[in-house]
Structures are given as structure tokens and as C-alpha cells.
Amino acid sequence: GSGTEEDPYLIARPSQLALLAQCVNEQTAGYFEPDVHYLLTADLDLSGYENWTPIGTGPQDGRYPYENPEKAFQGVFDGGGHTVNKLNVAYTGATTFTSVGLFGVNDGTIRNLHVAGTVSATTSCTDKSYVIAGGIVGFNIIAYEDAMNTRPGSGAIEHCSFTGSVSASCGNDPT
């Protein structure tokens, strides 16, 4: 495919999904921008990936993802009703921001996807750090507005499900 809505990039193998994560996280031109379309064309088994690298990351400078969404997934990912099986994310580290799942940070659209697996994140947190975990998406950036704040965002998760376990903790304090 060419990445358009009419001709999306096709993902049929786990290695292609891993390449998507790499391209988004490294901001490879033509793959991480808004409105790039992807279509999952088969069920995937990620058992060959001992520790999955989430698609889309957040800032590492203490800001929240919506304050700096450049490395978030911003495209359209259509799971085509398929399942990503045996997801394993086991993050342990010390960063200012940790968000894990099949997608780490989403500011695009993820739809028609089923995920099964285990997601866990453990980090040493301070007042300027946090950890977030989810099966499909760790942090979904959505628009927000109230009397004092306006925040842009276009993250959407539609017709998706997760089966498995999710856990996150800051040091010895599970959240």
C-alpha cells in the first residue's frame, strides 16, 4: 500500500508490526504523520517478541504526552477485526514518563482490533514522573476543554477489546 485511506499500508506479519513501532518511534518520514493508514490483514502471534516495544512514545522531559505528542501514533490503524495474540510488554526502568501497551501513546485512530496478552510496567516515580499501562493503548490523547484549560487531541479507540492482564507500579506503590 501507499498509506492512504484507499490504499493503506498492509500488515500481515509480526515483523511488519514491529517495523511500524520502530518507524513511529523514530519519526521516520511517511510513517508517523497524521492520516497515514494501516490495515492489519491477519491475526498475529507476538510470542517471538519477548518484550514488545510499544507503537508511539511520549516525551522524556517530564511533560505529559498531550503537551508534546510528536512521537505519539498519529495515523489510522484498522485491525480489520483481527487479533494480536501473545502480546508481552514487561517494562522496568526509571524514566520521567512511561506509557505501555500495544500502542504506548495514541493521538490517532485505532479501530476493529482485538489484543490478548500481558502488559506490566514498573518504574521508580517522583513527583515529576508517572507510569501508565493499558492493553491496547497506554495513553490516549483526547481533546479537552473546561473553563480554564483547552487541550488539543484526536486519539480515538473504536471497536477494540483486550483480554489478559495489565499492571503498573511506581516503586513499591502499585497504581
Across the structure, where does each feature detected by a protein language model lie?
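Surface-exposed repetitive/solenoidal architectures
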Residues: 1-175
